[in-house]
UniProtKB/Swiss-Prot annotation:
This is Histone H2A-beta, sperm. It comes from Strongylocentrotus purpuratus. Core component of nucleosome. Nucleosomes wrap and compact DNA into chromatin, limiting DNA accessibility to the cellular machineries which require DNA as a template. Histones thereby play a central role in transcription regulation, DNA repair, DNA replication and chromosomal stability. DNA accessibility is regulated via a complex set of post-translational modifications of histones, also called histone code, and nucleosome remodeling. The keyword DNA-binding applies. It is found in: Nucleus; Chromosome. GO terms for cellular component: nucleosome; nucleus. SUPFAM superfamilies: Histone-fold. The lineage of its organism: Eukaryota, Metazoa, Echinodermata, Eleutherozoa, Echinozoa.
Length: 88
């Protein structure tokens, strides 16, 4: 019986962030004795959403400053000017 091609968990979950790497970090980080199969997928999705949100705001900050490249200052401005991100 021919095996199907291996499919990465990230693409299976429709994510860009690496689910396997997040799973490894959860195991190695001594957070718990066991890590469920859904936990790294959920965490990777949350991290990807946060990264996208921050990059969107930083891109806007860069455009407001008439720049085509995001610099650390734009990231800082984006986070400081957003009420919820500023709380984190």
């Amino acid at each position: 019986k021919a095996k199907g091609k291996a499919k990465r968990r990230s693409s299976r979950a429709g994510l860009q962030f690496p689910v396997g790497r997040v799973h490894r970090f959860l195991r190695k980080g001594n957070y718990a004795n066991r890590v469920g199969a859904g936990a790294p997928v959920y965490l990777a999705a949350v991290l990807e959403y946060l990264a996208a949100e921050i990059l969107e705001l930083a891109g806007n900050a860069a455009r407001d400053n008439k720049k085509t490249r995001i610099i650390p200052r734009h990231l800082q401005l984006a986070i400081r000017n957003d009420e919820e991100l500023n709380k984190l």
